[in-house]
Amino acid sequence: MKAKEIRELSNEELQQKLSELKAELFNLRFQLATGQLDNPMRIRDVRKTIARIKTILRERELGIKR
C-alpha cells in the first residue's frame, strides 16, 4: 500500500487497517517459526506498511501537511 493511498483514508480506517496488519504480521511470524511461510518478503511489506500508517497518523496528530 502506497503512502498516497494511505493518506486518502480516514483516521478510523487507518486504525482498523493498522490492527488488521498487526494481526497479519503475528500470523506471518508464526508461520515463519513453524516453517510454513511461502513468501518471507511479505513480512517486510507488512512491517513497512505499518510504519507508513503510524507515520501518517502521527503527522495528523502534529498537524503536519504533506
Swiss-Prot record:
GO biological process: translation
Gene3D superfamilies: 1.10.287.310
InterPro entries, sorted: Ribosomal_protein_uL29 (IPR050063), Ribosomal_uL29 (IPR001854), Ribosomal_uL29_CS (IPR018254), Ribosomal_uL29_sf (IPR036049)
Signal peptide: none
Gene Ontology terms, MF aspect: structural constituent of ribosome
One cellular component term from this protein's GO annotations in UniProt: cytosolic large ribosomal subunit
Keywords of the record: Ribonucleoprotein, Ribosomal protein
Transmembrane intervals: none
CDD domains: Ribosomal_L29_HIP
A Pfam family this chain is assigned to: Ribosomal_L29
Entry superkingdom: Bacteria
PANTHER family tied to this protein: 60S RIBOSOMAL PROTEIN L35/50S RIBOSOMAL PROTEIN L29, LARGE RIBOSOMAL SUBUNIT PROTEIN UL29C
Similarity field: Belongs to the universal ribosomal protein uL29 family.
Name of this chain's protein: Large ribosomal subunit protein uL29
Naturally occurring in which organism (per UniProt): Caldanaerobacter subterraneus subsp. tengcongensis (strain DSM 15242 / JCM 11007 / NBRC 100824 / MB4)
